[in-house]
Amino acid sequence: MTAENTAPATPPPPSDFVRDIVAGHVAEKRYPKIVTRFPPEPNGYLHLGHAKSICLNFGIARENNGQCNLRFDDTNPVKEDVEYVDSITTDVLWLIAGWADAQLGFKPKGAKPTALISQGRPDFYLAPTAPSAQSEAFFASDYFEQLYNYALELIQKGQAYVCDLSAEDTESYRGSPDQPGRESPFRSRSVAENLDLFRRMKAGEFPNGARSLRAKIDMAAPNLWLRDPLLYRIRHVPHHHAGDAWCIYPLYDYAHCLSDYLEGITHSICTLEFVDHRPLYDWLLGSLDLPRALPHQYEFAKLNLGYTLVSKRKLLQLVQEKIVAGWDDPRMPTLSGLRRRGIPASAIRNFVTGLGVTKFDSLTEVAVFENAIRNELNPLAHRRLAVLKPIKLVLTNIAAGESIACEGTNNPQDETPTTRPLALTREVYIESDDFAEVPPPKYFRLKPGGEVRLKYACIIKLDEIVKDAAGLITELRCTADLTTRSGQPNSDKKVKGTIHWVSASQAIDAEVRLYDRLFTVPEPGAS
């Protein structure tokens, strides 16, 4: 008779300041539907830090019967690749499988925003669809035409201009936190000239870096992100999704807020480094007189984990320098690496959800993650006996060729555990670390004259240590007390040590990979 393993209980829905904000909006019926998004740039593989964002955004959508779009913020063709698009899609689908599948928002393949009239004004919107063979993730690059038209509108309103400063001069003119910036000498160009130059930028008339489009805000603003930030730059580089159609590309801050709007996002949730970007997010949306409800940005503290890097840029360096064997190296904190290592998606979800959501950066001990994995696997994983560094043990009172039947429990945490047959034979292997010829005090494993129990079998006593001419141990000769097996008269006899073993004749070879922490310092990203 078999028994199903008992899965860990589902934890109650979490509570935090972001969810409190959303709950307030739901109560006042501010939006017809809660729509969040997970918008990675496809320039690397996802890691544990992304898992926190994925679970927060999909979790909020799940708790409110809403939707969470998977969107690629692919506005920098130099660093992005379809390999990353594929890996990110795989990782997200794996992480939410059986948990938030119903909340995943895709779009019809090849679909672009549809023109519509909202409150009497022209508008654009890209409606989601359920994942299928005919759908795909959202891409910011699918909005390039609309983003370009929005930029023309900003120019026409006198809120954007074409600037000829080099990247170095632009940075120099920006100033510092305690010193105002200087206005670009090209800031006063006429609307007509700016429109002409921007259209020619799009047509490919100028080389990389020759010109850029900047917002016209305030070069003396205390917030440096409001000092006439770049909106577009020239890059004659093919795009992984858009091909060769464009040679001007929008900057992240410009594309991100408008992509949120085009998708009908209600809550744009990101990490704390974007707090200073929020005024620009709001300025861009407010400057365009958009007719539909605007998204709002909310920030939370990202995951910092001890002995772990959670930075795509630094993880890429490990891959490029061949310190690890690729993005899915089992020592990597990438979702693909963790999956290859055998860590269940549910363990990752429970870990990041259990950390909570705050506005304060902190360092989480890696042991917390390891405990989350252990708690998830303990009720589910079948146990097996294994010996990695064997030493031969001969049970002298068992005849050669004799096999004594024993039973091992598959999972002792099952309420009705199943068992498997084991064979106790004359020769077995034990772990070399489970024997000490000269034992330290309070050593309870095998030692000269000592007794231990072979797990699921019987108690044995060490009688003789056999060595070769060089003085190296070749085998341990023991006596097995077969009356201490399960169901036998002395099965309740107690000894202080129980050790693993495998039959020398019936064991199978296995390749075992033991992975430890990749870094030896608690905060590898700090150096």
Walk through the language-model features, giving the residues of each.
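N-terminal Rossmann-like or analogous alpha/beta NTP/dinucleotide-binding catalytic cores
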Residues: 2-183, 273-297, 302-311, 316-319
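Generic amphipathic alpha-helical segments used as scaffolds and interaction surfaces in large
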Residues: 9, 138, 268-272, 302-306, ...
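Intrinsically disordered or highly flexible coil/loop and linker segments, enriched in small
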Residues: 31, 101, 160, 207, ...
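Structured alpha-helical segments in the cores of large, soluble enzyme domains
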Residues: 52-62, 85, 89-92, 244-256, ...
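Active-site cores that bind ATP or allylic diphosphates and position pyrophosphate for catalysis
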Residues: 76, 82, 89, 112-114, ...
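Extended, domain-scale alpha-helical bundle/helix-rich regions
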Residues: 326-425
